Amino acid sequence: MSLSAVLALPATAVPLAAPSAPDLATTDGFRRTCAAQPVNADVLRTDDERLAWAICRDVDQVRQLSTWARRGLARINHLQPEDQAAVVAEVERKMDEVRAEMRRTRLQLERVQLGAGRSLRIAPGQWQVDLDGDGELSVWERHFFALPKRRHGEPQFGMPSDDAGHYERHYDLNAVIDLDQSDVLWALSYHQFIEGLLINIRAFDVDLQRRELVLARPALLRQAHGLIGRGLATSGRLRDAVLAETDDQNEWISHPRQVNSVFPIPLEAADFTTWRVMLDQVGVLWHGRHLLPTTAGAGGLLGSLAPVCPAGQGLDIAKLYLQPPPAGTRASLNRLPAALTTMCRKVDAAHPLSPLPGRLERDTAGATGMSALRYLYWVN
């Protein structure tokens, strides 16, 4: 058939190549899938497409940050003291860039509703990226996204290694995960917390000459409070979703009856109870129903804060974020601002002191760090 004849056929008669399905379980598939991702998320139509887009964007964010850090450190080493303001401006610019990107991926994750179904199969150990931008793929870059082997006990953390044997001994290089809704909630809560933290930081400017923090954008504190509060709620939904699962197929976070999981720390029934208690206590503290004990004599985690509030009062975290001090309020890096005392509230039956700081101190006292690490794993 001639070319002119083909062009004369109805459009439905011309065979079109179907777009390839996302493949995040092989090295070549990961590269091909991520290279094909659109810049504009508005064209995404399915949950699989949204998840592939979010994963590829997040991995690329890690690449951009790693490259920026490598080149930035090289520049900083040659800067003079009078150039410190330029360094601060560059860091602030990068935080704003990352925050905007986190928001874009968060909005796509919020749209994913898998129900009881499954989505993509992913194999993070196959994601190989030139992270530092030097044009080479080092051993640590080939295995950067690999998952530590699943086991009880203290996980091993350290700087990236160029010893291939290290990864073979301590990492599950072939781990696969069949994504379900609990995995989406896990990723979403991380995005909400990290974006909220960056917004929190950008509420402040740094006065290098006077070594002070300046509350420059109080409205950002209100944004941060809302986003972090949503992260706490998402973590609660994540816990409930994991416990409700009845299958056992290439899981990420798993409940005690699921054994086919690659999550580095096996979670037991008591861990899920602690997860709920922690979320409850953090939630009421975050929303101002419990008060933070910051009176004279407070030790441990709050020792550097005391005394913010007089005896019989506690710090209202919600008020601090939702009714912040005025723009221009300054805080020395060595001394808390007097304006914080206006965030204190009388302790009463409706607003008791939070038991959370004491609980954290008891749980981590004399420990090797496992308790704190588990909290990070569970509650993001």
Mark where each language-model region is:
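Bacterial N-terminal signal peptides
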Residues: M1-P10
